[in-house]
Design a protein with these regions (language model features):
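C-terminal intrinsically disordered, low-complexity extensions immediately downstream
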Residues: 155-172
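Glycine-rich ThDP/TPP pyrophosphate-binding loop and its adjacent helix/strand module
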Residues: 1-155
Length: 172
């Protein structure tokens, strides 16, 4: 589906921003051992579209700025684009996965020090003089929004099976 979507988006110059969250693993396999690519955004060249990699996608401000640039490019009618965000999956891939034992402990420790939420809190305090109380208010508000969204999803009706294929284009 990825290649077909990118090919059609490029062919029709669709305003599509494809974001690849590269956490370096395909379930438990290190992607760097599975491909000769250093960056997945280089796949964009095969579709004749631009691809950009954010090497430190744990910096929230950098991700925001690069996403805004990419969105502006796409919205301006230039066609699709790939934006790769290199980050780290701190937990396992799925509940039935055996944790993160397959990861290099030194690399895991290095990335855990770069937790995006902690880095953003530090940046807000150091560069913007945001106080601990304000950070706590933000965290509490986000937690409340998540709880409300979860509660809504728990009681929301399931979609009807007969509409599952609505708006799906299949050119077979």
């Amino acid at each position: 589906p990825f290649y077909e979507a990118m090919n059609m988006a490029a062919a029709f110059k669709l305003p599509m921003l494809m974001i690849i969250q590269n956490n370096f693993f395909a379930i438990s396999e290190d992607f760097r051992k599975m491909t000769g690519l250093q960056s997945l955004s280089t796949r964009a060249a095969g579709f004749g579209i631009p691809g950009v990699t954010v090497e430190n996608a744990n910096d929230v401000e950098t991700v925001y700025n690069e996403t805004m640039k990419a969105a502006e490019y796409v919205r301006a009618g230039n066609g699709p684009m790939i934006l790769e965000l290199k980050t780290w999956r701190q937990m396992g891939h799925a509940p039935n996965e055996p944790g993160t034992k397959y990861k290099d402990p030194a690399e895991q420790a290095m990335w855990l020090k770069r937790d995006p939420i902690k880095l953003l809190a530090t940046k807000l305090k150091e560069q913007y003089q945001v106080q601990d109380e304000q950070i706590k208010e933000i965290e509490d508000r986000v937690e409340q929004e998540l709880d409300e969204a979860w509660a809504f999803a728990e009681v929301a009706p399931y979609s009807l099976p007969e509409v599952a294929m609505d708006h799906i284009y299949a050119g077979c």
